[in-house]
Amino acid sequence: MLSGILIAALLMTLWGGWQPDIAHASDEFDALRIKWATLLTGGPALDPADSDIAARTDKLAQDANDYWEDMDLSSSRTYIWYALRGNGTSDNVNAVYERLRTMALAATTVGSSLYGNADLKEDILDALDWLYVNSYNSTRSRSAYNWWHWQLGIPMSLNDIAVLLYDDISAARMATYMDTIDYFTPSIGLTGANRAWQAIVVGVRAVIVKDAVKLAAARNGLSGTGIFPYATGGDGFYADGSFVQHTTFAYTGGYGSSVLETTANLMYLLSGSTWSVSDPNQSNVWQWIYEAYRPLLYKGAMMDMVRGREISRSYAQDHAVGHGIVASIVRLAQFAPAPHAAAFKQIAKRVIQEDTFSSFYGDVSTDTIRLAKAIVDDPSIAPAAAPNLYKQYAAMDRAVLQRPGFALGLALYSTRISSYESINSENGRGWYTGAGATYLYNQDLAQYSEDYWPTVDAYRIPGTTVASGTPIASGTGTSSWTGGVSLAGQYGASGMDLSYGAYNLSARKSWFMFDDEIVALGSGISSTAGIPIETVVDNRKLNGAGDNAWTANGAALSTGLGVAQTLTGVNWVHLAGNTADGSDIGYYFPGGATLQTKREARTGTWKQINNRPATPSTAVTRNYETMWIDHGTNPSGASYGYVLLPNKTSAQVGAYAADPAIEIVVNTSGVQSVKEKTLGLVGANFWTDTTQTADLITSNKKASVMTREIADERLEASVSDPTQANNGTIAIELARSAEGYSADPGITVTQLAPTIKFTVNVNGAKGKSFHASFQLGEDTSGPVDPGEPELPSVIVDNADSAGVTRTGTWKTASTQTDRYGANYLHDDNAGKGTKSVTFTPNLPIAGSYEVYLMWPAHFNREDAVQVDVGHASGTTRTAVDQRSGGGVWHSIGTYEFLAGSGGSVTIRNDALGSPDGYVVADAVKFVAVG
């Protein structure tokens, strides 16, 4: 207990004597404060007649009224709420401030039944006074129990209350509250999400007390580690879109979403003011949306594989979190540069409209409802197209495949990234959520919501290979071989060298992601722990009755709950989904398999996986179908292979099994490879530093490789070092011959015939995929050195000191990584028809040259960029679509050129596409073809 003398001193500070140096005249600080209040409440223009706003304000008022009724208002109270007694426990104190913030919102939000209630305001202020004396003051330790509450959580709530009730708080009271915040959070010095929270605490407080120096410090704090600058290690956003927090955990949808929200709000607050953000690295924030969030949002849900321990929070299930991220995108759209603002609005509109499971408006603030409805109701804003992509997140050991109608997330770990996080009594059963886990999303939008995590069998997470019924400890792995390769941003291969030391379990696991199928392979599965080893094919939440139809090899299986079966000779399985269409799943087992299955009702509580005080302990029950392959006890060199076929009917799965589009090329502990015959794709993961071959691909080092052969005319190849530990090169040989090629920097082509040979310099590449494209041709000449002078090639880059002429103002950027060289030019989507960039090569000989362009692609680009090729016979105009195909060379035809600098390629910014978009000028390549 505080002494009487100390209490008296605190009360004197609160009520008497010292007068704060706070100006009361209307000024820029007042405008910023009112802007923040509007962000919190929606402002005076809020339309209470809108049904979604009314529902939100009604709930706000109901929650506030419930809290108010339960308050202890007595003069002798020893707590504010009995359920949150314990005035030194930071968890409880933080929760008290959060409740008071809700009450302050209800008292200041138009349409709330408690709007303007003077008694409510007075009781809130009395509670703040009591808390100052008993719980939150400068005599407290800054880090007791949980530092986050004292230094970040409580100050954020108190700042908001101070803004909302600003006109009701005396100068003395205000100064006391603000001084306390300054005691706990005087400056900004952390990383990632914690830094963003520090910045918002310091910044909003600075607005309240009118401190220009602190407000500038808050703004500048965004330029520090883990926010604006891309990370190259540790916490923060990476150039590939990854987000890491606590050094080794994938957290895009957890701490990353907090960075996004907090950064967006602070940038919005300061936009248009004296303290507007001017750091050029703020442009990285726009890229977060395209690279980090767009691929990981599925019809309103944020993928759980990047939410860390937050998946164990009952109030933060995937759609609620996804809605919060979309709210941040809506916020960014209010002040981002015009082309980004337009793109953000399109993305937000699509996600809001696609989520038929959970209303976006039910999870966001009244101000966000107001802003989002202005977007959704605007017929001139077209929703963005659904993502159709494959993306490798090398910096956080994740991969995602998105197709119209389904998506698959893959969560891995390594020596760099940990398997799962479980701290602060959260995520107690997260054991296998990042250990080769597959997350399949389809039209069953409730699959990972509605109590999935407290009821799913945590020992049997889909995709994993485990020692039956045993947990694993959190931490990084013992192997660096985790990662994969992306081909053309559409297809990919991933793998993980798995090792659970506690169970002497090792395995090599690969996933090959094509168009509408995902192939999973496992090899070298061995253990000496005396425990059955199994690979989990799926663990799918069923409908409320648990009677989803399913078949094996076309024969109906029992749908009764509590039924366990051993199915032998299984070639294919079909499981009906939970919706009328778009949620069925097929499973194909090449060569047949023995499958263990169990259909059961599972009961659990959120409290069992999250033991924090406010977590509900009510039992919930859900039904599941689990399928796994039993490798037996102490297996040695066991293997498996299966194919996931999302959204296929039983007839379609049966037809696929009869004539599969895939072929397993090899599945050993040395190399795993699959061919997709209809697409001309071959993927291969090479596990050792020995020369090995899979189909047409030979590699001398550990590597992930994918190729695509198109109509016997072109061969595309992508290569990565998934170990991120090779400080040299990977030598690749492809059993084809070629006549010409284009390749990323870092690739050296040494031979085109009779086979293609090239090396990839992966030193410092951090798992990046390197791309090359080969023009196929007959082997008629024996070994061909592509560097011979009779086949010269010349590249002119926008950054070259000679050979590049600009007309009009072009901006230089380097934010996108699918570029050639250090940077590229863009027209700022302005001055259409008045700008151009001309690339003039110095060609060593006259003759025919195939001309290629490279550009960093984005869906806000022009889709019909006008290109003039000046050649020996005149000028030819063509057009390219810069919305896709980034980072690779695109042929625009073959032309005759004279030797020297008489030829040219001019990229124009004429506005001929629909809609108009950015035009970029990056690099041009001239390759002699005869």
UniProtKB/Swiss-Prot annotation:
Changing residue 246 to A: Loss of activity by 60%. Activated by Co(2+) at 1 mM. Completely inhibited by Hg(2+) but not affected by other divalent cations. Intensely inhibited by NaCl and KCl at 150 mM, in particular by the Na(+) and K(+) ions but not the Cl(-) ions. Partially inhibited by iodoacetamide and N-ethylmaleimide at 1 mM but not by dithiothreitol, reduced glutathione or 2-mercaptoethanol. Residues 1-25 form the signal peptide. The active site is at 255 (proton donor/acceptor). One of its GO terms (cellular component) is extracellular region. Keywords: Calcium, Lyase, Metal-binding, Secreted, Signal. Ca(2+) binds at residues 515-517, 676. Its EC number is 4.2.2.12. One of its GO terms (biological process) is polysaccharide metabolic process. Optimum pH is 5.5 (in the presence of sodium acetate). Active between pH 6.5 and 9. Its main location: secreted. Changing residue 255 to F: Loss of activity by 50%. The keyword Nuclease does not apply. Plays a role in xanthan depolymerization pathway by cleaving the linkage between the terminal mannosyl and glucuronyl residues of the side chain of xanthan to liberate pyruvylated mannose. Is highly specific for pyruvylated side-chains of xanthan and is not effective with hyaluronate, chondroitin A, gellan, heparin or pectin. This is Xanthan lyase. It comes from Bacillus sp. (strain GL1). The lineage of its organism: Bacteria, Bacillati, Bacillota, Bacilli, Bacillales.
